[in-house]
Amino acid sequence: MTSASQAAPVALPVMPDAEDARIMAKAALFAPPPSVMEDGRKDLVGLSREQLTEALAEIGFPAFRAKQLWHWIYHRGETDFRVMSSIAKPQQETLAERFVISRPAVTECLTSVDETRKWLFRFRDGQEAETVYIPDPVEDRGAVCISSQVGCTLSCRFCHTGTQPLVRNLGPAEIVGQFMAARDAYGEWPSPKGETPRLLSTIVLMGMGEPLYNYENVKQAMRIVMDGDGIALSRRRITLSTSGVVPMMDRCGTELAVNLAISLHAVTDELRDELVPLNRKYPIRELIAACRRYPAASNARRITFEYIMLDGINDSEAEARELVRLIAGIPAKVNLIPFNPWPGSQYTPSRPKALERFSRIVMEAGFASPIRTPRGRDILAACGQLRTESRKERRID
């Protein structure tokens, strides 16, 4: 495994234009609280290497201690300074007095009949988000579906999370902490190296929230995850799903270069305006153009177009052909997802014949189009079913 210094070169940050700046200004209104305990101790999880070095310098620790701590936190998964044998006991005590290495609290953990597991995590301010582990049905590996926000601002009509207004963004510690807590649950520490099999083999940013509306925090969390001296998960094993925040897609491709998934779900603006209201701001033409220029896309790393199959709504043969026309020339695959019902939902999943017919048309055009087998439906852990009871407190002036 390469070290951080030998990893893929870090891209220079892209200077934001006016629309990027507007998005980031709005994100600041939903900023996470500081990663500080009530007793004043600072959380080291979620800090970049530079921030960790600075935090230790403030208490007189040399820079090499940051490298040691990084190894203990992200490679070994350790939360107790007292067992860090490469650090002298007096310094262990100083670290414990000034810092913590946190995990989100597990409020609830449910396991499906198909072994999918869902956690309800509570953060320091009492807000909650859900995380799901989806095991591969054949091999000893699986994906961790991570949330980026508490609630969501997009109000997609078929999505349970969309019925929960946005409360706030999650910070880097809360995002990477979901993956670390999942590793705790499955005992996958220290981090597997090289070709060693990983039970938690991939991350999909497909949980609660729109990752590109919380881009800076997501970016920092994923850079921590990808660092070769810690968790060391390759960017090829990370997929970010967006409903189409077009201005941030270029930055994501340049700065993170992770795999991209697009929540498409319709092939006309008229229908997508209804199903995915964000389409009114960034219509299909602009979204597809952004996909064509996404820097990380290639035949080896295809863009995934996610398509929720709704009975009688978006599952006709004509729509399958239009989908093929839209994505022609893009290195892509199409995931067909039968709608997963949730309490109060108004849709039903497409019928098996419609699913098979749609898939066949897309496949015959040269695109892989698997029909996703629902996982975790019985515990409301399937695609589009996540939701918590967190609410944004009204400010009292």
UniProtKB/Swiss-Prot annotation:
Subcellular location: Cytoplasm
Enzyme class: transferase
Domain Radical SAM core, chain residue ranges per copy: 138-377
GO cellular component annotations of the record: cytoplasm
Binding annotation for S-adenosyl-L-methionine: G209, E210, S241, S263, L264, H265, N340
Main location: cytoplasm
EC nos: 2.1.1.192
CC cofactor: [4Fe-4S] cluster
Cofactor binding note: Binds 1 [4Fe-4S] cluster. The cluster is coordinated with 3 cysteines and an exchangeable S-adenosyl-L-methionine.
Active-site residue list: E130 (proton acceptor), C383 (s-methylcysteine intermediate)
InterPro entries registered for this protein in UniProt: Aldolase_TIM (IPR013785), Methyltransferase_A (IPR040072), RlmN_N (IPR048641), RNA_MTrfase_RlmN (IPR027492), rRNA_lsu_MTrfase_RlmN/Cfr (IPR004383), rSAM (IPR007197)
SS bond list: C145-C383
Example of a GO MF term: metal ion binding
Assigned keywords, A-Z: 4Fe-4S, Cytoplasm, Disulfide bond, Iron, Iron-sulfur, Metal-binding, Methyltransferase, rRNA processing, S-adenosyl-L-methionine, Transferase, tRNA processing
GO biological process terms, semicolon-separated: rRNA base methylation; tRNA methylation
Family membership noted in the UniProt record: Belongs to the radical SAM superfamily. RlmN family.
Its biological purpose: Specifically methylates position 2 of adenine 2503 in 23S rRNA and position 2 of adenine 37 in tRNAs. m2A2503 modification seems to play a crucial role in the proofreading step occurring at the peptidyl transferase center and thus would serve to optimize ribosomal fidelity.
The protein's name: Dual-specificity RNA methyltransferase RlmN
Source organism: Granulibacter bethesdensis (strain ATCC BAA-1260 / CGDNIH1)
Gene: rlmN
